A protein has these predicted regions:
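Autoprocessing Asn-cyclization modules and mimics
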Residues: 1-53, 58-59
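Extracellular beta-strand-rich solenoid/capping regions of secreted or surface-exposed proteins
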Residues: 112-139, 168-183, 202-204
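Extended Gly/Ser/Thr-rich low-complexity repeat segments
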Residues: 10-31, 59-84, 107-125, 136, ...
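Short glycine/acidic-rich loop motifs that flank beta-strands on beta-rich extracellular proteins
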Residues: 150-156, 174, 196-202, 220-226, ...
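N-terminal catalytic cores of secreted or lumenal carbohydrate-active enzymes
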Residues: 156-164, 169-171, 179-181, 194, ...
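Acidic, glycine- and Ser/Thr-rich low-complexity intrinsically disordered tracts
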Residues: 40-45, 52-59, 64-86, 91, ...
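Right-handed parallel beta-helix
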Residues: 137-148, 183-194, 207-221, 235-251, ...
Length: 553
């Protein structure tokens, strides 16, 4: 089935007179994206509709996952009178030039219609195909409010000009504030709220810019987007700072929108933010690209093939069903050396699934995720607290606390060679199949350091570790990692980790790890310092002081 065709049950869709006004809202095939697609035609007799622009994937039920996520619906129709059934809803009929509104009170009040997606653009001279841009420099915006922007619609001719999984458009005016060719620009003590699209984005050439001490709330799209040039040698989106912002209720229209999205952008610092009530992932650092010239998949149009071929030679040319080795692609994946630290994140993954609090995937090395507090993400849709997804390497995940994680109850997952050290994963609360509190879900993992972590379970049946290559054999092995000096405790089963420790020791790892209550001072109140006599101290595990995390100077 193509990406324009939608079969439907009899009577659900109609060939409405104002069909151009009608949208289909759908989770197509996968649970990690939501599309809003205008209808082109409806054949009531055959039960087949077509949309004017393609979906991200074929428009069938969500089919991939550990459980059925279709029961609450995967496709809806919007902007038809048939669906106007509760206060606060409205329908626009452009043929009649009428708005139908069911008001909250006795009469309509404060009706506003946005006219712009962008309110401010800071733009230098962009030479898209050339090696250098001329940025605007040295502006500060302080104490401003931005609101009532519109959502930028998807564009048929720009399919493939997108970030990973179509979570955002590449180089488009989707945010109220946009920097494009900008350096040393600061937005301080500002407020983005009540808008249909994203809050602020930094496109292409964006360096040493700062968004700080601000509030970003109730947006239809993403909170903050950093998106550099596609894979190539032009690496000019970097060294930006996102700090001390309160970001919440994000993705209220486009559910997949992240609070902070970093794509092909490196050396950034994302720190001391408070992020909550997000329908999908809180923070993404990504470089996932369909490495193809065939016109299929995520972001394929963004690849700067002339630069890649001049630098990488034949090894990087696309072949059917082939993705070049990460080490060959890494020089062109500019999402490297980012620092994600001391953020507080809770109540994410409210509607979509297969997402996380912090997500790193398919991008460059040197990213560091440290001293973040991820807690009370108890949505049934939750996957991992922190995840290195497909083909992600050289990431350091250290000194994080993951407390009360729902969904699969997984604290940290890696797919690749990454380091997981001195993290505390406590009180996992899985709603369905539990993989493990730490999961190794792909190969290779040789050389991964997994040391000085504390895993505390309060329920029976949980696993400390899960080792499974989710794309097929061979599976990762404990002995391929440098795994040791970890502490395990289950309040209901003192022998909980015995089998894991025995298996690890047979493979030459976990020689010094052990069982024991870590003696946190007050974990219920977020105090993960140790009491005197904690066995963690003998293992060289350091306490994590959450007083330094979140909205702090």
């Amino acid at each position: 089935m193509d990406k324009f065709t939608l079969p439907f049950p009899s009577g659900v869709l109609k060939n409405w007179p104002n069909l151009d006004d009608v949208d289909i809202v759908i989770r197509p095939n996968y649970g990690w994206v939501l599309n809003i697609l205008p209808l082109e035609s409806v054949e009531e007799s055959s039960g087949v509709a077509r949309t004017r622009i393609p979906a991200s994937y074929p428009m069938v039920k969500v089919r991939w996952g550990l459980r059925d996520v279709n029961s609450n619906g995967t496709v809806w129709v919007e902007n038809v009178l048939d669906a106007l059934d509760e206060p606060g809803e409205w329908v626009l009929n452009t043929k009649e030039q009428k708005i139908y509104l069911w008001p909250h009170g006795e009469k309509p009040e404060d009706i506003e219609a946005p006219q712009l997606t962008e309110l401010i653009r800071v733009e230098g001279a962009i030479d898209y195909d050339g090696p250098h841009d001329e940025p605007v420099r040295g502006l500060t915006f302080r104490g401003l409010s931005f609101t009532r922007g519109d959502r930028w619609p998807w564009e048929k001719e720009r399919a493939g000009s997108t970030l990973q999984h179509d979570w955002e458009m590449f180089d488009r005016p989707t945010a109220m504030v946009r920097m494009r060719g900008a350096e040393n620009i600061a937005f301080e003590q500002c407020h983005w709220f009540d808008s249909g699209g994203a809050g602020i984005r930094m496109d292409l050439h964006a360096q040493s810019n700062r968004v700080a001490d601000s509030v970003i709330e109730h947006l239809g799209g993403a909170g903050i987007v950093l998106a550099g040039y596609g894979p190539g040698t032009k690496d000019v989106n970097r060294y930006n700072e996102i700090s001390r912002n309160h970001i919440h209720h994000i993705g209220e229209i486009l559910w997949h929108a992240a609070a902070v999205s970093v794509w092909q952008s490196g050396g950034n610092r994302i720190a001391h933010n408070l992020i909550h009530d997000v329908n999908y992932t809180a923070i993404t650092v990504s470089g996932r690209i369909s490495w193809t010239k065939e016109g299929r998949g995520d972001g394929w149009r963004t690849i700067r093939w002339k630069e890649v071929e001049q630098t990488g030679g034949e090894a990087l040319l696309p072949k059917p069903g082939y993705r070049p080795d990460w080490k060959l692609r890494a020089p062109f994946l500019h999402g490297r050396n980012n620092l994600v630290e001391r953020n507080e994140i809770h109540d994410v993954m409210q509607k979509l699934w297969d997402g996380d609090a912090i997500y790193i995937s398919g991008t460059g090395g040197g990213n560091r995720v440290r001293e973040n507090f991820v807690h009370d993400c108890l949505s049934e849709n939750m996957c991992e607290g922190i995840r290195c997804d497909d083909d992600q390497h050289e990431t350091i995940i250290e000194r994080n606390v993951v407390l009360r994680n729902g969904g699969m109850g997984v604290g940290i997952a890696i797919k690749g060679i990454n380091h997981v050290t001195n993290n505390f994963i406590v009180d996992s609360t899985p709603f369905f199949q539990h993989r493990g509190m730490i999961s190794l879900e792909a190969v290779p993992v040789e050389g991964s350091i997994i040391q000085q972590n504390i895993l505390v379970a309060t329920k029976p049946g949980l696993r400390p570790f899960y080792l499974k290559n989710l794309t097929g054999p061979p599976d990762p092995r404990l002995g391929e990692t440098k795994m040791d000096f970890n502490l395990y405790w289950n309040t209901t089963d003192p022998k909980w980790a015995d089998a894991h420790l025995a298996a690890g020791r047979l493979e030459g790892v976990e020689q010094n790890s052990g069982l024991g209550e870590p003696l946190f001072r007050d974990p219920e109140k977020g105090d993960f310092r140790f009491k005197a006599g904690s066995p963690a101290l003998k293992l060289g595990i350091e306490p994590v002081d959450l007083r330094k995390v979140g909205l702090r100077k």
